[in-house]
Amino acid sequence: MSAQLINGKEVSQKRLQAVAEAVAQRQQNNLHTPCLAVVLVGGDPASAVYVRNKKTSCQKCGIKSLSYELPESTSQEELLALVDRLNVDSEVDGILVQLPLPKHLDSQAVLERISPDKDVDGFHPYNVGRLAVKMPLMRPCTPKGVMTLLEAYGIDPKGKKAVVVGASNIVGRPQALELLLARATVTVCHSATENLADEVAGADILVVGVGIPNFVKGEWIKPGAVVIDVGINRLDDGSLCGDVEFETAKERAAMITPVPGGVGPMTIATLMENTLHAASLHDA
């Protein structure tokens, strides 16, 4: 029996509609329109597509967007100076620096320069730390989007065994914190994990984000598990696939996210929610 598909596109549209309604309500209440500043350095085609998608979502939600497209040759000092200006700009509620940055730039230093209350990606150590101590302020977009999907499909992590494959600062680590917050029993697997297949086989909820096509084999999946595939990989033939071997996994899982159309749309919807939240922080 094939797994039920978790439709991130459908859930994200509902979330975007809710943001649009909240923005319209703010305007009726004479509160300022939320504003997102997006910074793109260099000409990476995939990054340009992501930035364009974010601007389109802003338009759908009634959120103002400012775009800063900088040349590949931009120095660390120039980029930090722009972040400093945006930090003190009262019109700007959220700042997003599109990753990856060119190799000569220090991404971590740039992310740490963003004011935590404008860090709508949720990458600043302050925001990750608040999540770790159960006091979230700005929650990282992809992990929060995953939790929204679980909620939308009536999946309560409480008491479940959750396994996160991948320990990146962007997905794996904050995802584990989100699942802990939801009272799951959480295991994090990484490059030094032994017997990965055995760890995966014990998961009631499996979240995979390693950036390697078909890394998790379908036969590893516990029958009846919920599988959330965060990976998005472009193959040589131009098609997209996730980090989980989808065709075999869907014959064992109860629910599974497709790639594309699963987690990806939720990341952008959460970014819009975080920008709205940032605006509310700046109302006072």
UniProtKB/Swiss-Prot annotation:
GO-annotated molecular function: methenyltetrahydrofolate cyclohydrolase activity; methylenetetrahydrofolate dehydrogenase (NADP+) activity
Chain sites annotated for binding NADP(+): 166-168, 191, 232
Family: Belongs to the tetrahydrofolate dehydrogenase/cyclohydrolase family.
This protein's pathway: One-carbon metabolism; tetrahydrofolate interconversion
Organism: Neisseria meningitidis serogroup C / serotype 2a (strain ATCC 700532 / DSM 15464 / FAM18)
Catalytic activity: (6R)-5,10-methylene-5,6,7,8-tetrahydrofolate + NADP(+) = (6R)-5,10-methenyltetrahydrofolate + NADPH; (6R)-5,10-methenyltetrahydrofolate + H2O = (6R)-10-formyltetrahydrofolate + H(+)
Keywords: Amino-acid biosynthesis, Histidine biosynthesis, Hydrolase, Methionine biosynthesis, Multifunctional enzyme, NADP, One-carbon metabolism, Oxidoreductase, Purine biosynthesis
Coiled-coil spans in chain: none
Cited CDD domains: NAD_bind_m-THF_DH_Cyclohyd
Role summary: Catalyzes the oxidation of 5,10-methylenetetrahydrofolate to 5,10-methenyltetrahydrofolate and then the hydrolysis of 5,10-methenyltetrahydrofolate to 10-formyltetrahydrofolate.
EC numbers for this chain: 1.5.1.5, 3.5.4.9
Keyword Ribonucleoprotein: no
InterPro entries the record matches: Aminoacid_DH-like_N_sf, NAD(P)-bd_dom_sf, THF_DH/CycHdrlase, THF_DH/CycHdrlase_cat_dom, THF_DH/CycHdrlase_CS, THF_DH/CycHdrlase_NAD-bd_dom
Gene that specifies this protein: folD
Subunit structure: Homodimer.
A GO BP entry: L-histidine biosynthetic process
Record-linked PROSITE patterns: THF_DHG_CYH_1, THF_DHG_CYH_2
GO cellular component, one term: cytosol
Gene3D superfamilies: Leucine Dehydrogenase, chain A, domain 1 (3.40.50.10860), NAD(P)-binding Rossmann-like Domain (3.40.50.720)
UniProt-recorded name of the protein: Bifunctional protein FolD
